[in-house]
């Protein structure tokens, strides 16, 4: 198995398709889970604190 430019030409299948819940191209066709909203894994919407930018805390 080689790495680099020759193996990049073998990437021709769609890993992610459009999600039914959020509409983004983040639904993994094989794993049946959306990486953007968490559809297929949980009924709750996927959200993490590290995805939003927090306001700066004054240091003085």
Curated annotation (Swiss-Prot):
Pfam families: Ribosomal_L37e
Residues reported to bind Zn(2+): 19, 22, 34, 37
SUPFAM superfamilies tied to this protein: Zn-binding ribosomal proteins (SSF57829)
Required cofactor names: Zn(2+)
GO BP annotations listed: translation
Keyword Ribosomal protein: yes
Keywords, in A-Z order: Metal-binding, Ribonucleoprotein, Ribosomal protein, RNA-binding, rRNA-binding, Zinc, Zinc-finger
Chain intervals annotated as zinc finger (C4-type): 19-37
Protein task: Binds to the 23S rRNA.
Name under which the protein is recorded: Large ribosomal subunit protein eL37
The species this protein was found in: Methanosphaerula palustris (strain ATCC BAA-1556 / DSM 19958 / E1-9c)
Chain's gene name: rpl37e
């Amino acid at each position: 198995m080689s790495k680099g430019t020759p193996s990049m030409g073998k990437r021709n299948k769609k890993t992610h398709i459009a999600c039914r819940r959020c509409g983004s191209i983040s639904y993994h066709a094989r794993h049946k889970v959306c990486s953007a909203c968490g559809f297929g894994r949980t009924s709750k919407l996927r959200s993490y604190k590290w995805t939003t930018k927090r306001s700066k805390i004054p240091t003085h």
